[in-house]
């Protein structure tokens, strides 16, 4: 091979490497993290690991609590380990989200009654993780949900028997 051919091969390889490295960089990826039961207590409360998003950390924490209670009522929650039983939804009615939408809107309103049935499980500094993006904050934490209290409320409201 001549010197001219070697230069052409090196130039072609350099252009190929540069072209391959000029891909679109993904800045944010969507992850669908499902809530999971971390532990259960004898008083009917469940510690649930969940995610919430908001404009600031306080709003994200409130959304995290709403999400945990919502999942318990309407969707059920999977267990994080094999020695804890998964939790079925409290409302087993078909189309429960649509049927009880008015009740749910009042219950989950800002400052709503849902706050009486959940609390931050671990109050130590650093127990919740916050991830900041350009426009929002995403929070991951563990929330204690009073499932026994929620069942009693739903029975009292006539939603479940």
Task: Give residue ranges: language-model regions.
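Bacterial N-terminal signal peptides that target proteins for export
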Residues: 1-11
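Bacterial N-terminal signal peptides
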Residues: 10-19
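Domain-level marker for long, solvent-exposed, non-transmembrane regions
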Residues: 22-161
